[in-house]
A protein has these predicted regions:
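Gly/Gly-Pro-rich "capping" loops immediately C-terminal to redox-active cysteine motifs
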Residues: 23-27, 35-64
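Soluble non-cytosolic domains of exported or imported proteins
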Residues: 20, 53, 76-80
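Short, cysteine/histidine-rich loop/knuckle motifs that typically chelate Zn2+
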Residues: 32
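C-terminal capping alpha-helices of c-type cytochrome domains
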Residues: 75-96
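Electrostatic cytochrome c docking/interface patches
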Residues: 9-25, 37, 58, 96
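Positively charged n-region of N-terminal signal peptides that target proteins for export
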Residues: 1-4
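Short Fe-S-cluster ligation motifs
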Residues: 57-78
Length: 96
């Protein structure tokens, strides 16, 4: 029981930091094309994250490899960063 409590206590900050890094990555790498609110920008006809039907795993692949007008981020982001930003987007772009 004590081990479970310890594991849960240690996991909470990791989950929080992953969410925070997703927020930071989104605002530094994604928002210039997809908008601060993730709705996309009409000028570029960039897809909205809010209506995306992609699963988190599919989104990770798009971030990794790129698609249509979106560049690949495989050389700019680590796999952990890609997972963090995809999870952040799929969570609805929370501010905290």
């Amino acid at each position: 029981m004590k081990r479970l409590a310890l594991l849960l206590a240690l996991a909470a900050p990791l989950a929080a930091s992953a969410g925070e890094s997703g927020l930071v990555i989104f605002h530094t790498q994604c928002s210039r094309c997809h908008g601060e609110d993730g709705r996309g920008k009409a000028v570029f006809t960039t897809p909205s994250f809010l209506t995306s039907k992609l699963t988190r795993e599919e989104m990770e692949q798009v971030i990794l490899k790129g698609r249509a007008k979106m560049p690949a981020f495989s050389t700019k982001l680590t796999p952990v960063e890609i997972t963090s930003v995809a999870a952040y987007i799929k969570a609805g772009l929370p501010e905290k």
